[in-house]
Amino acid sequence: TVTWSGKKDRAGCGGGNWLYAARSLGATRLAGFDLVPVPDEALAIERELITITDLTKRMENQARYDIAISTEVAEHVGSEHADTFIANLCGFSDIVLFSAALPYQGGIHHVNEQWVEYWNRKFRALDYVAFDIFREPFWNDARIPYFYRQNCLLYVKTRWVEMLRTRGIEPTVEPRSLVHPELLLQAVNRARPEGERNFLRDAMILHRQAIGGEAPGADWTHGYGQEQLWG
């Protein structure tokens, strides 16, 4: 596995849940970045560890960390700023844990839902290569929200690829977009009249009968984020 030695960064950190988790695993140097502050009751970590900044503008004189994490944030940044967002993220570390919403995944203020291949091209342009090491092991683990199981990839600066290969970890040069069954069920139910939506029932059938697992604990059939753009 790829580990860090006590330093971590995340772009779009919200209340700092990833920072809290990193600290619990021994990280000692932490920094979070987001566009807007969150209420005190939503904080998982000290507020002073979180910097409020414009993630769409190129950051200068960035500190370097052992790993940078951005999960389900990039879709909230307009496509005209996507290159800058990824450049900022890579400016923090040679190792980046990244996920972003697929098209029609849905959510609040999703203005740039894109396929994995779209983001992969942007990382490749900065000399990073993908390692698809999380999706298969966690695909059917309903304790984890499906969008993490569907979208999480590790991006690593190419100079570290051979080191990872010596540890038996191979890169995925062209990672593919994978649509999780829960997203399919969500999309189908969203298209149904409200009184006919059966996401939780459908997901229970999927998890308990098809794969022998527990049903997910949340109904993700809330509104779709981008329809407001089409008016």
What residue ranges belong to the model's regions?
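Flexible, glycine-/basic-rich loop-and-beta segments that form/coincide
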Residues: 149-194
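Conserved SAM-binding loop
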Residues: 1-108, 117-120, 155-157
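Short proline/glycine-enriched turn/loop segments at secondary-structure junctions
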Residues: 141-145
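Conserved S-adenosyl-L-methionine
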Residues: 128-139
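K/E-rich alpha-helical interaction surfaces of small helical-bundle regulatory domains
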Residues: 112-127
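Membrane-proximal basic amphipathic "stem/tether" segments
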Residues: 175-231
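A generic fold-level signal
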Residues: 45, 147-148
